[in-house]
Amino acid sequence: DTVFQGAHQFPDAVGRISRLCLALEVIPVFVPPLEHGMQNTIESFNGLWQAKVWQRHRVENVHELQACSDRYIAAHRARTRMATEAAPARRSIPENFNLNLHAPLRGQMIFIRRTDETGQVHLLGQRFAVSPDWLHRLARCEVDFDHHCIRCFALRRRAPAEQPLLTTIAYHRTDKPFYGEL
């Protein structure tokens, strides 16, 4: 979605929501679309909601759909309460916060990507070489705007705690003006 990642046809584009996250020192994480697994919780939830609400219930109007959805979401929250309570506390946006969409980017963005047949990943509208030995596998790519680099780590479903560094890529993003509104 361009609101988050920026216009896909332009290299190095960063959208307004990602800029908001970076300004608030929150690290945006992007997972590959339609990729199954723990790293894609929202895609999994959307699939569950469609199966349990949208496809299961026949409703006459949007109010009935909202009621079915509310019941499902309440049940889902009850089932996942322990995990939610164990998550880090959420912070409020500071009252004096003023978003400057034109400020230079600071902090990090993380992209979970699957390498292609040559060991490259596609992110920020570009291809980056990760490893010729890591083909068709998941990699965590940390774009560090402060240190001007992209660090790529191997991800394995069988050993999620082991994430060896595959490569560090020099990355100098020129500060481009932001086009658009909040």
Describe the function of each predicted region.
Residues 67-71:
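A non-catalytic, amphipathic alpha-helix used as a structural packing/dimerization or gating element
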Residues 1-64, 75, 161-162, 167-181:
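RNase H-like DDE/DDD metal-dependent nuclease/strand-transfer catalytic core used by mobile genetic elements
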